[in-house]
A protein has these predicted regions:
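Alpha-helical transmembrane segments of multi-pass small-molecule/ion transporters
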Residues: 2-270
Length: 270
């Protein structure tokens, strides 16, 4: 199931989202913003977990930063915001995906790997570019900056596959989820969810106090920074030697938190 999502439905969802969207060049600034928010959270997590054992550090690094925007936030945005804000979500997600679609996995292998890495730059680059979702986002950003549009036939072809991505990503998450959680493992989940909530509070303050955007964009970005952990994080956790089942359980809790936050935002800010 994970291979289907990683190599087929998620890349098609990315291609369709960008191919079907119209946006102004100024909105491309959302790409570095999405990356900065995700990478900033990763750096903080790195700084506060130096004494954690290797598997636990991989668990925190891969699940504390970044957001599930394509499978979770985008449907909410399409329901309560204008089509332009849906495009903004896709652009923000492009920056977010630099970490979620391979960046965090590559860096975590370097930081919490089981053996010494002889060529760290080559190691990170290999992990990054071996991630098909990352390659797809990178290609789309380059084409967008160059003003090249995807062929309408390709957009139409990817639409039914893209529509299946949300269901398959959530189904994959359900297959990985572990409901047998001891007190010690539950404490790790509580720390992770608390850390993500703290990041969301800080990022919300940055959005409302520091960014020169209108209130509609602020409301959108608030929804995005309260979105749940990436649907890919449990798989990357397992691939990095961490507890993939526990990551799946924690992911489900962040989805519940995200639904509550999105509902409150829709009722109060939109």
């Amino acid at each position: 199931m994970s291979k289907i999502v990683f190599t087929f439905t998620l890349p098609c969802a990315v291609l369709h989202a960008f191919g079907a969207a119209d946006f102004s060049p100024e909105m491309l600034l959302l790409v570095p913003l999405g990356f900065a928010f995700a990478f900033g959270a990763y750096l903080v997590t790195f700084a506060i977990t130096p004494r954690a054992k290797r598997s636990d550090r991989a668990f925190y690094l891969l699940n504390a930063c970044g957001f599930n925007l394509g499978c979770f936030a985008l449907p909410f945005v399409q329901a309560i915001f204008s089509p332009t804000m849906a495009v903004a979500t896709c652009l923000y997600d492009a920056g977010n995906a630099f970490m979620m679609a391979g960046g965090s996995y590559a860096l975590t292998g370097l930081i919490a790997g089981g053996s010494r890495i002889q060529h760290p730059v080559r190691f990170v680059a290999k992990r990054l570019f071996s991630s098909l979702p990352f390659d797809t986002y990178l290609l789309i950003i380059v084409l967008s900056v160059a003003g090249v549009r995807l062929p309408a036939e390709l957009v139409a072809f990817t639409e039914p596959i893209a529509n299946a991505n949300s269901f398959l990503a959530m189904f994959m998450l359900g297959l990985m989820m572990s409901f047998s959680v001891s007190r010690e493992r539950m404490a790790k989940v509580a720390r992770l969810v608390g850390l993500r909530a703290a990041f969301s509070v800080v990022l919300t303050c940055i959005v409302w106090l520091a960014l020169p955007v209108d209130n509609v964009m602020r409301a959108l970005l608030t929804l995005l920074v309260w979105s749940p952990a990436s649907a890919l994080a449990p798989m990357y956790t397992q691939m990095s030697g961490g507890d993939g089942g526990l990551a799946g359980f924690a992911n489900a809790l962040t989805i519940i938190l995200g639904v509550i936050a999105a509902t409150l935002i829709a009722l109060t800010l939109v």
